[in-house]
Design a protein with these regions (language model features):
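Nucleic-acid-processing active sites and adjacent nucleic-acid-binding tracks
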Residues: 230-246
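Inter-Walker segment of RecA-like/P-loop motor cores
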Residues: 34-93, 186
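Walker B catalytic acidic pair
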Residues: 98-99
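Conserved P-loop
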Residues: 1-61, 136-137
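ASCE P-loop NTPase helicase motor core
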Residues: 102-172
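ATPase catalytic-site recognition across NTP-hydrolyzing enzymes
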Residues: 158-218
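Catalytic P-loop NTPase motifs of RecA-like helicase/translocase cores
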Residues: 3, 35, 102-104, 131-132, ...
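Short acidic, Gly/Ser-rich segments with clustered Asp/Glu that frequently serve as metal-coordination loops
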Residues: 216-226
Length: 246
């Protein structure tokens, strides 16, 4: 409820229409249905009197026009690994990924690789997940190196929310959900089995070691995925050498 979707979408459309003419852009969500429901169906309201919008539903395309300029905005859903194939081939001048943390990394990598027009920019928004999430480690923490502008939205940035509404939302959450959805922090989820996991400490290079003993571990995972590991003991430490994950 920080208003990030409105701010980012309006900003993206206005930037695209100011800088380009006759170009293709992409707006991506978890699914095209959720994208239409939460984002694109509201564009004529958010930008009333500024741009004209014409939707071509069979092509999943919206043509935006104003002052003699016209650009096409294609809609894509990034719900699973197979979605990456759907966005291949198109050349883009910019892309907006709404709720990017819900999308697989393969889709995002393919989508960002489509932006080859001179002056193209990448726009992302999301609610935080865990601190080991790929988008946090590879994009948020690398914002400076990637020359990205990182904006942290909270409910206080949404001037349309009254004090009573904000207070009600704050009372709905506690613990990790409060930290993520109210404070906007990338924190570890409660209930994780290995909350102490630290990638810098627990992940080591795969090199030959004088293993003296081997064991197999298996977590069947009645609800969660099955995980089978081959462990080797060397120098008083156990190393997970191989794994099967299904």
């Amino acid at each position: 409820r920080s208003g990030k979707t409105v701010a980012m979408t309006v900003g993206f459309i206005m930037w695209a229409m100011t800088r380009f003419d006759g170009c293709n852009f992409a707006i991506c969500g978890k699914t095209i249905e959720s994208l239409r429901r939460n984002v694109t169906s509201n564009l004529p309201v958010w930008l009333a009197g500024v741009f004209s919008f014409k939707e071509h539903r069979t092509e999943n395309k919206i043509v935006v026009s104003a002052n003699g300029k016209s650009n096409s905005f294609y809609l894509f859903g990034g719900k699973d690994e197979s979605s990456a194939a759907l966005i291949q081939g198109i050349t883009l001048a910019g892309i907006l990924l709404d709720e990017v943390a819900l999308m697989p990394e393969s889709f995002v990598n393919q989508a960002t690789a489509r932006c080859s027009v001179e002056g193209a920019k990448l726009w992302f928004n999301c609610n935080p997940e865990g601190p080991s999430h790929w988008f946090y480690t590879k994009w948020v923490l690398e914002a400076s190196r990637r020359k990205m502008l990182h904006l942290h939205f909270t409910m206080d940035d949404n001037l349309s929310l009254s004090a009573s509404v904000k207070a009600r939302y704050e009372s709905l959450y506690s613990g990790v959900f409060y930290d993520r959805f109210i404070r906007g922090l990338w924190v570890v989820a409660e209930g994780l089995i290995y909350t102490m996991f630290n990638k810098d400490f627990h992940v080591v290079p795969s090199v030959p070691r004088p293993y003296e003993k081997y064991v197999m571990s298996c977590d069947y995972g009645t609800i969660n995925p099955t995980s089978i590991g081959l462990w080797g003991k060397a120098g008083g430490k156990w190393y997970r050498m191989r794994e099967y994950y299904y």
